[in-house]
Amino acid sequence: MHHQDIVSIDNLKTLPVLRKSELVRLQAENPPLGGLIAGTVHDFNQIFQSPGPIYEPGMVKKDWWRSARALNAAGIGKGDIVQNCFSYHFTPAGMLSEQGILAVGATVFPAGTGQTELQARAASEIGVTAY
């Protein structure tokens, strides 16, 4: 199947499903991205590791992960300070959220996980408006 074969929503039903276990196997056989990209790892700004392990490429571009729409729908935007408690360690969750937060014009406090008392204190002192 080629991208030009997808001309309608109905064509999406014909796309094969790639299961997580298959992705792990492909990446183990052809590290790091399983031969599934049309370039090299050097074409990306970031590489993340998610449980599996699964390696995921990423880019530092405005809303690369397409998370701004959900944040905008939640009313987050310019003037907000968002305490981003997703992990920045290995997984893309922290950067995924951060790029969306920046795309809607809000300020990011990259807090990560843990240290509950410090998190609460920082939220109060910084004036966090979203979590």
Question: Locations of the language-model features?
Answer:
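Nucleotide 5′-phosphate-binding alpha/beta core
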Residues: M1-A73, G77-D80
